[in-house]
């Protein structure tokens, strides 16, 4: 097999669903760059994360440089650039949550799951990520699991909280 054939067969390809959804979304914006975040969300929804190869493929559909898509993908913390677990735990590490007991809650989550921040459990069930602020300062320390916000989290309640996401 020639090198050019190898490159062609290994090239990332958007699914027809992804491509048509991105093209549809693109028509809602005057500037195709504005559709890049939606395009990234489309790929992530289909695949669970955004592989490196998706960046130039999205750029090609939108007619913009891959570097523009990359800039958006790296800016937004909700775009995952590596595989993540079925459930995403986002722990707030703002000053208010830190003072409210963030470290002990994170420590208990790490102990229960056997992972550190930025890691995924071996069974692919959970990914643990820090976030700057969840806007739930009146209930610090706070965390989110998927789309559910939990406030006033205490270390002794972590096991029960995690069990709800089996």
UniProtKB/Swiss-Prot annotation:
| Positions contributing to [2Fe-2S] cluster binding | 92, 97, 133, 137
Q: Name one GO biological process term.
A: respiratory electron transport chain
Tell me, what is one Gene Ontology molecular-function annotation carried by this entry?
quinone binding
EC id? 7.1.1.-
Gene3D superfamilies, alphabetically? Glutaredoxin, NADH-quinone oxidoreductase subunit E
Details of cofactor binding: Binds 1 [2Fe-2S] cluster.
Keyword terms: 2Fe-2S, Iron, Iron-sulfur, Metal-binding, NAD, Quinone, Translocase, Ubiquinone
Read off the CDD domains from this record.
TRX_Fd_NuoE
On whether Protease is a keyword of this UniProt record, the answer is no
Q: Which reaction does it catalyse?
A: a quinone + NADH + 5 H(+)(in) = a quinol + NAD(+) + 4 H(+)(out)
Entry cofactors: [2Fe-2S] cluster
Respond yes or no to whether keyword Metal-binding is given for this record.
yes
Domain of life the protein comes from: Bacteria
The record ties this protein, via Pfam families, to:
2Fe-2S_thioredx
The UniProt entry's sequence similarity note says: Belongs to the complex I 24 kDa subunit family.
Among NCBIfam families, the record links this protein to: nuoE_fam, PRK07539.1-2
**How is the quaternary structure described?**
Composed of 13 different subunits. Subunits NuoCD, E, F, and G constitute the peripheral sector of the complex.
- Say what the protein does: NDH-1 shuttles electrons from NADH, via FMN and iron-sulfur (Fe-S) centers, to quinones in the respiratory chain. The immediate electron acceptor for the enzyme in this species is believed to be ubiquinone. Couples the redox reaction to proton translocation (for every two electrons transferred, four hydrogen ions are translocated across the cytoplasmic membrane), and thus conserves the redox energy in a proton gradient.
* The protein's name in its UniProt record: NADH-quinone oxidoreductase subunit E
């Amino acid at each position: 097999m020639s090198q050019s054939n190898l490159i062609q067969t290994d090239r990332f390809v958007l699914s027809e669903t992804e491509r048509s959804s991105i093209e549809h979304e693109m028509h809602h914006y005057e500037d195709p760059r504005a559709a890049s975040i939606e395009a990234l969300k489309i790929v992530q929804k289909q695949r669970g994360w955004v592989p490196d190869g998706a960046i130039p493929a999205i750029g090609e559909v939108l007619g913009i440089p891959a570097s523009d898509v990359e800039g958006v993908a790296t800016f937004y913390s909700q775009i995952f650039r590596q595989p993540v677990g079925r459930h995403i735990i986002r722990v707030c590490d703002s000053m208010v949550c830190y003072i409210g007991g963030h470290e002990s809650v994170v420590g208990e989550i790490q102990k229960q799951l056997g992972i550190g921040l930025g890691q995924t459990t071996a069974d692919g069930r959970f990914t643990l990520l820090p976030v700057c602020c969840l806007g739930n300062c009146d209930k610090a320390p706070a965390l989110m699991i998927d789309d559910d916000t939990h406030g006033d989290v205490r270390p002794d309640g972590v096991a029960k909280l995690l069990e709800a996401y089996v």
